[in-house]
Amino acid sequence: MFSQYGVDTTRVYSCGFSAGGYMSHRLACESPRCYAAIASVAGTMSTAAYSACIPSRPVPVLQIHGTADAVVSYNGGVGGVGVDDVITKWTTIDICPATPYVVQLPNTNIFDASTVESSLYGPCSSNTEVKLLKVVGGGHQWPGTTALLGGLGTINRDINASGEIWSFFRNK
């Protein structure tokens, strides 16, 4: 398929929302040479995948997650690890600086009851980076979307997750 459609195999990415985010992390753990970078929105790692994750090379990772996510808890829960543990896992794998560059992003929409804090770990070994966009007060939602997933919390409108993901991927 790759040769038939002329796919640049050095620019294949994975991103996913919720269970798709879990999938992206697992793909990076199990097949790191297939992906230039991954992004996860509102999904972390299962405890089993977290324990088994020993990729053969560093992988750039973007994690976007709401602190008020009641479906996939920011702090982890039954069967899943918390966001901070996921970030620590990838910064260890990618051999990143221990201290991130932290920026509070502009609160451009004061009515969405949430803000975004960006933590960038990098540059890491092999010129990778790990980035966390912590949506303070954000729910189990895709930031920037106009479609509301009913009952799943606040949608942040200060960032557009799709744009943030492409911005992260495009130079990897």
Model-derived segments and their meaning:
Residues 29, 77-84, 155-160:
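Soluble non-cytosolic domains of exported or imported proteins
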Residues 25-29, 166:
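Short, hydrophobic alpha-helix immediately C-terminal to the catalytic nucleophile
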Residues 1-19, 29-34, 105-106:
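Gly/Ser-rich "nucleophile elbow"/oxyanion-hole loop immediately N-terminal to the catalytic nucleophile
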Residues 17-26, 71:
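Glycine-rich nucleophile elbow surrounding the catalytic serine of serine-hydrolase chemistry
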Residues 153-172:
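Catalytic active-site module of serine/aspartate enzymes centered on a nucleophile-bearing elbow/loop
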Residues 132-148:
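Active-site-adjacent mobile loop/cap segments within catalytic or ligand-binding domains
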Residues 1-10, 48-55, 122-124, 171-172:
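Surface-exposed acidic, glycine-flexible loop patches that form ligand/cofactor-binding
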Residues 36-126, 137:
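The feature captures the conserved acid-bearing segment of alpha/beta-hydrolase catalytic domains
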